[in-house]
Amino acid sequence: GVGFGKDALFTIWRWIIPRRVWYNINHTENAGADAHHRPVNLTAAAMCRGRTMSALTFSTQEGRAASIIIKGVFTMCTAATYTTDSFYFGRNLDYEFSYGDEVTVTPRAYPFSLRCMGDFRTKYAMIGMAYVAGEYPLYYDAVNEKGLGIAGLNFVGNAVYHPAQDGKSNVAQFELIPWLLGRCATVQDARTLLDRMNLVDTPFGEGLPVASLHWMIADNHECITLESTKDGLHVYDNPAGVLTNNPPFPMQLFALNNYMQLSPKATGNHFAPNVPLNAYSRGMGAMGLPGDLSSQSRFVRAAFVRANSRSGESEAESVSQFFHILGSVEQQRGCCELDNGKYEITLYTSCCNADKGIYYYTTYENSQITAVDMHKEDMDGTELVSYPLVKEQQIRWMK
């Protein structure tokens, strides 16, 4: 997404630039429905050099020229599922700045043009967080009207996409979420399509590298992880119901063996029965639970918190509990410093009631929960519906 403002220098995520995009010129000041958009025409000035690309040049309708810096992205994210009376699916997206993300509803029969397989129209409507490039929703996470959810998380250094293969469904990384959610009602449906799918190394725009991702795919019955590595496409059962970044998922899951002694219950003296040891604090059954922000530690912590979370069955109680689960691995400004002197933070946390099609979210600046109900939109419409994020902190003053 474009780093929004009136200056001539912007920052853009590396794989979502089309020939023509829209940017929100009042992103910070006007995040509501009145946000103003202007078209921008982009032309690539140079190819990618290592981890940082050279500038792109663009001109606005007013004819002014400016430069855009493109950088590699190492987002540290966490996705999770949770079930009470309904099924919930969501994630934290962690990075140092926002790309202009919006909650976006894609209606049924919406046209997509796949790079290798031509045009198709979605069978099911979907809602999620996306950057909309032109009329193309580039989803980070989404759920369709049947209750199937998908989230893409960074997988740098291990994700490998391959050339197109005859006899395969050749899908680009940025096409995966709408392709699966537009056609599949369940994880089992997705498994069937994945059996003959090949993730291809096709970028969204010319001269732009693809995003290195892996995905969590879930419904109210099962959860899987999808990874494309140098030895091919892998679909793993995900009994933990969470996903972070590196290492590859089998290693993340195996690491839970090191923590099987953890318990939410009070601990006894198993160290030395003859030594007088006392549990001097509540919570000591979970001594050793990781608390740092590395992806492996976040996987363990999120898996433990999710597995032991208890919630009431109401919508309000369930949604609140889901945000608490992901809150256990959120990032605060100042705790994860980057090489450029900036800090990675949890830009947004999402929680979608997949059964009802309600997408809840909070942002770093606004801890109040905001919601969009996809069923209140025209799901048989012809256009995307997007809602800019409400980022200004909402405080309820008591009188």
Regions found by a protein language model. Give the residues of each.
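Short, Lys/Arg-enriched N-terminal segments with co-localized hydrophobic residues
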Residues: T57, Q61-T75
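Short, low-complexity intrinsically disordered segments enriched in A/P/G/S/L with frequent Arg
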Residues: A8, V21, A35, S54-A55, ...
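Proteins synthesized as precursors that undergo proteolytic processing into mature forms
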Residues: G167-P203, E315-F323
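C-terminus-biased signal that marks the final domain/tail of proteins
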Residues: I70-Y88, T202-G205, V210-A211, N220-E222, ...
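Tryptophan (W) side chains
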Residues: W13-W15, W22
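Short hydrophobic targeting helices and cationic amphipathic motifs
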Residues: H27, H37-R38, L42, S59
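Catalytic cofactor-binding cores of redox enzymes
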Residues: R196-H234
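A contiguous strand-loop segment
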Residues: F74-K168, D201, S386-P388, Q394, ...
